[in-house]
């Protein structure tokens, strides 16, 4: 435990020393550049006399200071590489600025690689032992996420895969547009149940549909729906008309029953007046029965009522359905009354 603490203190001391040294070199460079403008004429004259690129024939002081500054920072980076707690965060940022100044190999005594070993590179990249590097797939298409109680929508999909997702309860299903092989539609979606609510789906749509089959299907079904509506209206109208006709038929049947009852009462009254003989004869007469049947069976819809009188007996008659005019009806009814009177007289 004590050895680790001493090692940490030693590393910190080295880092501080290298940073202080680099700061001093940077200060000297600043002073040199500030006085360079005032001494520019003298330096150029000296270079012409000596025929070299420096005042004393040695290296340029600016290049020398730059080399020292870069070397100091390089040593600091090397020290930080051996110190695990800061090896992940600090060296990466410093390495980027350090590599940016490695454009000129002649002006920098330290190589851009810096003699780094494989372990130091792994530490700077943040890849430790026993860990797998993570990557994120770039999604170039438009992506939108929705939550719904059903995974179905108005498009046709084909499932092409499913896999388990880490730290989730339900698997994720992958779908593509059914018309991709025929029309090249690249729309896809991912469906997964939510862990908090298993009845809810989280649907991720990637891309847009470019197929036209769905639009054509919708266009074909739209007139079919209108036909259903029109057929329903026709059925309703036909049903209403049928009910009206049934009501009229029922009314006519009621009227026929009432007229038949009136005729039966009149016949009974005549029978009582003429005695039992005429009654028996009338009941045995086939002509009276036939005419009574004809009267009941031929009664149809009436447009108006006509009154006819035969002696002291009067009756109300309805127009027959098979009689075209009033003259035919009158002759038919007169013959009926004559037969009825002959039967009663006998």
Swiss-Prot record:
Keyword annotations: Brassinosteroid signaling pathway, DNA-binding, Ethylene signaling pathway, Jasmonic acid signaling pathway, Nucleus, Phosphoprotein, Plant defense, Transcription, Transcription regulation
Q: Which Gene3D superfamilies match?
A: WRKY domain (2.20.25.80)
Task: Locate the DNA-binding region by residue range.
Answer: 146-214
What triggers production of this protein?
Induced by reactive oxygen species (ROS) and salicylic acid (SA). Early but transient accumulation after osmotic stress (e.g. polyethylene glycol, PEG). Up-regulated by E.amylovora.
The alphabetized list of GO BP terms reads:
brassinosteroid mediated signaling pathway; defense response to bacterium; defense response to fungus; ethylene-activated signaling pathway; negative regulation of leaf senescence; regulation of brassinosteroid mediated signaling pathway; regulation of defense response; regulation of ethylene-activated signaling pathway
What post-translational modification does the entry describe? Phosphorylated and destabilized by ASK7/BIN2.
Subcellular location(s): the record lists: Nucleus
- Grouped into one coarse class, the protein's main location is nucleus
Recorded GO cellular component terms are: nucleus
What's an example of a GO molecular-function annotation for this chain?
A: sequence-specific DNA binding
**Ranges annotated as biased composition (Basic and acidic residues):** 267-282
Q: Does the keyword Lipid metabolism apply?
A: no
What protein family is recorded? Belongs to the WRKY group III family.
Q: What is this protein called?
A: Probable WRKY transcription factor 54
Organism of origin is Arabidopsis thaliana
